[in-house]
From Swiss-Prot:
This is Probable biotin transporter BioY. GO terms for molecular function: biotin transmembrane transporter activity. InterPro entries: BioY (IPR003784). GO terms for cellular component: plasma membrane. It comes from Rickettsia prowazekii (strain Madrid E). It is found in: Cell membrane. Keywords: Cell membrane, Membrane, Transmembrane, Transmembrane helix, Transport. Gene3D superfamilies: 1.10.1760.20. Probable biotin transporter. Belongs to the BioY family. Coiled coil: none annotated. The gene is bioY. It comes from the Bacteria. Pfam families: BioY. Its main location: membrane.
Length: 194
């Protein structure tokens, strides 16, 4: 009997906790940020290690966050990810961390994420969410990511090499990731309608 009472209490307490989360937006926002950071971390570890910047699955997760979070929340999520990485938690590509990694060849892309994610979130709110618009918004976001990355890399290896190493070699994988996200987003949206 005692076991049953304890189990019921836990279930009731869990229901109250879920109710509390749904009414307290600050806690819900914190939970979303933590979940987003974990997702970005996990996608950071799926890499094709090329130099000077590895290809990762970041951008698919960043698009998901940009399309499901508000502009403010998407910005805070990537800012939190960058902050904990710079502070030493090994969340960056291939479990890297620290200010030296951030100031290295990938730093410009992270700054691009800070700008591009809120831009995608804002555009998502302004345009109808169909396959074409979703794809265009993702291309705009990726253009911001790559532009910041190229500018950052150019200060280290020169503009011509930065365009090649920081953009051209990423075009095929970037297009594939955008298409994956666009198809995934359309599929999820169709599921919601049913």
């Amino acid at each position: 009997m005692r076991y049953i009472m304890n189990s019921l209490f836990k279930i009731l307490y869990l229901n109250r906790f879920v109710e509390y989360l749904s009414t307290n937006t600050y806690i819900l926002d914190i939970v979303k940020i933590v979940m987003g950071v974990i997702a970005i971390f996990a996608s950071s570890q799926i890499t094709i290690p090329i130099k000077p910047v590895a290809i990762t699955m970041h951008s698919v997760i960043l698009c998901i966050i940009a399309f499901t979070y508000s502009p403010r929340l998407s910005f805070l999520t990537i800012l939190t990810f960058i902050f904990i990485g710079v502070m030493g938690l090994p969340v960056f590509c291939q479990f890297s961390s620290g200010i030296n990694y951030f100031l290295g060849s990938a730093g410009g892309y992270y700054l691009g994420f800070l700008i591009g994610m809120p831009v995608m979130s804002v555009l998502k709110g302004k345009l109808a969410e169909n396959y074409l618009n979703v794809t265009i918004i993702c291309i705009i976001g990726h253009a911001i990511f790559y532009l910041c990355g190229i500018i950052w890399l150019a200060s280290m290896i020169g503009l011509k090499q930065a365009i090649y190493s920081g953009f051209i070699i990423f075009i095929p994988s970037g297009l594939v990731k955008i298409l994956i996200f666009s198809c995934l987003f359309s599929y999820i949206k169709n599921l919601k309608r049913k």
